Amino acid sequence: MIDRSGPALVHAWLGAMYLDGADGLIGWIDLDPAVRPPRDNGSRDVEIVLETGALEPGPVLDAHVGACAARIRDALERLPGLTRYALEHAPAGWAGYYAGQPGPPLPDRLFLDGIRVSEQLLVSLDFDAGELDQLTLRLGHEGAAERVFLTP
């Protein structure tokens, strides 16, 4: 449950981050349309979820959030290539099904909806293609694309 009574911390780039349960933070950043087109309603936000474990507010948590922000920025700088990787390595049948649906080409429909960073600083990019399931791309410790899977 998100505690919206006030931010748990405010990061210089990520902005206000709110408690998300006992071991996480959640926030939203606006992305430049050059990085990712806005949502259908014009909103430029992307959800950011950071796993923090049992870290208490203070310098250690601040350092963790800073490291998460650096990982997110790195992934966003490489977003076009990571998006291609996600499409090329999507589960069998998934890309074929979506490519056959009416509308723009699949690469243009794959929409970065959220970014998660684990306690171990592993980044996951959650892409929406307009249906219920999301296509998730997990990056490894060095930031390279590692695994693509569906999440409900």
For the regions a protein language model found, what residue spans apply to each?
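Acidic, proline/glycine-rich low-complexity IDRs
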Residues: M1-I29, P33-R39, Q101-P152
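Amphipathic protein-protein interaction modules
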Residues: A63-G130
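N-terminal "domain-start" segment
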Residues: M1-L87
